[in-house]
UniProtKB/Swiss-Prot annotation:
Stimuli inducing this protein: Expression is positively regulated by the aspercryptin cluser-specific transcription factor atnN.
Superkingdom per UniProt: Eukaryota
Protein family (similarity comment): Belongs to the short-chain dehydrogenases/reductases (SDR) family.
Function: Short chain dehydrogenase; part of the gene cluster that mediates the biosynthesis of aspercryptins, linear lipopeptides built from six amino acids including 2 highly unusual and nonproteogenic amino acids, 2-amino-octanoic acid (2aoa) and 2-amino-dodecanol (2adol). The core structure of aspercryptins is as follows: Ser/Ala-Thr-Ile/Val-2aoa-Asn-2adol. The first step of aspercryptin biosynthesis is the generation of the fatty acid precursors, octanoic and dodecanoic acids, by the FAS subunits atnF and atnM.
Pfam families on file: adh_short
PANTHER family the UniProt entry points to: PHOSPHATIDYLINOSITOL-GLYCAN BIOSYNTHESIS CLASS F PROTEIN, PHOSPHATIDYLINOSITOL-GLYCAN BIOSYNTHESIS CLASS F PROTEIN-RELATED
Gene encoding the protein: atnD
Keywords assigned: NADP, Oxidoreductase
E.C. code: 1.1.1.-
Phenotype upon gene inactivation: Abolishes the production of aspercryptin.
Identification of the protein by name: Short chain dehydrogenase atnD
Xref: InterPro entries: NAD(P)-bd_dom_sf, SDR_fam
Residues bound to NADP(+): L41, K66, D90, N116, Y204, K208
Length: 314
């Protein structure tokens, strides 16, 4: 029997050195919203969308000043004006999420949502009554997705269904490494807000595993709906040089520095995976997890009946 850790490491190293095609898919006339669009993967994906003829690209960001700087960077590099908009959202604040969704309801259409924003920290903190990583990466992310779905499912004025809308959740290969001990709890989200049970060193990876469970569960429900179809998928950009580790202790960043220098993709290379996932409008990737442009199954070792309980709790 294959050693799962060796298999994971083999895939990881193979993935990091694979060459990803430069995006060439057309997003002509599309309206696209990217959370965390002011930096890293989100910024570079937004830059591609503008270059690929999107009609509107919304950078949903916490800091409007940084968002405006990102907008200027995109306009300078693409020589395209009047496409990028900057909207505010704070995923630590449910009311901010609801406000963004309400604002989006006034859009003429919404074709693509890239749920890219997230945090990685080993520091325990509560936001309201939930641990901060779970609130941002899971609860607020999927609250926003659910709130945006009605707009994405609208028909156009002529009553014709346009190209199938897409929701892309930015995931991580790290979901395979977490023990996710909370999955054994009677109430999973209660366990996730209990500091005594928390292993913050793997909390980010746990949040990414829960994301995958929710992607699959929501995709299944959407496929059974009588409303216009929406493709919901998840994508791993691989190990990338972004600001994700900004809340990681300095010592840890120094120790991982050589690995990042040798193995990590730059943000533009990683963003190509997001653009590829966003272009998949034929339904084939619905509920799927993508890595290096390939579809993969979810981590089988965690795909127990508790996955259903996790989704039901949400």
């Amino acid at each position: 029997m294959a050693n799962p850790e060796r298999s994971y490491l083999s895939r990881f190293f193979s993935s990091q050195f694979s060459k990803l095609p430069y995006p060439s898919q057309s997003f002509k006339d599309a309206v696209i919203l990217v959370t965390g669009g002011n930096t890293g993967l989100g910024l570079e994906a937004a830059r591609h969308f503008v270059r690929l003829q999107a009609a509107t690209v919304i950078l949903a960001v916490r800091d409007l000043k940084k968002g405006e700087q990102a907008k200027l960077s995109i306009e300078e590099s693409t020589k395209v004006q009047g496409v990028v908009e900057v909207w505010q959202v704070d995923l630590e604040d449910v009311r901010s999420v609801q406000s963004l969704a309400a604002k989006a309801s006034s859009l003429p259409r919404l074709d693509v949502v890239v749920a890219n924003a997230g945090i990685s920290t080993n520091k325990w903190a509560l936001v309201g009554d939930m641990e901060r990583t779970i609130q941002v990466n899971v609860l607020s992310t999927f609250l926003l997705i659910l709130a945006l779905l009605p707009k994405m499912q609208e028909q156009d004025i002529e009553g014709q269904i346009r190209a199938r809308p897409r929701v892309v959740v930015v995931s991580s290969e790290g979901h395979e490494t977490t023990a996710f001990a909370e999955r054994k709890a009677a109430r999973i989200f209660d366990a996730l807000r209990d500091q005594r049970q928390a292993n913050m060193d793997e909390r980010y990876d746990t949040s990414k595993l829960i994301q995958l469970y929710l992607v699959r569960a929501l995709a299944e429900r959407l496929s059974r709906s009588d409303k216009p179809p929406v493709t919901l998928n998840a994508v791993s950009p691989g190990l990338c040089k972004t600001g994700l580790l900004r809340e990681t202790p300095l010592v840890a960043r120094l120790l991982t520095g050589p690995v990042m220098a040798i193995l990590a993709r730059n943000a533009e290379e990683g963003s190509r995976t997001l653009v590829h996932a966003a272009a998949a409008n034929d339904g084939e990737t619905n509920g799927k997890y993508l890595r290096d442009y390939l579809q993969r199954l979810y981590a089988a070792k965690k795909a127990t009946p508790r996955r259903r309980d996790c989704c039901r709790s949400f």
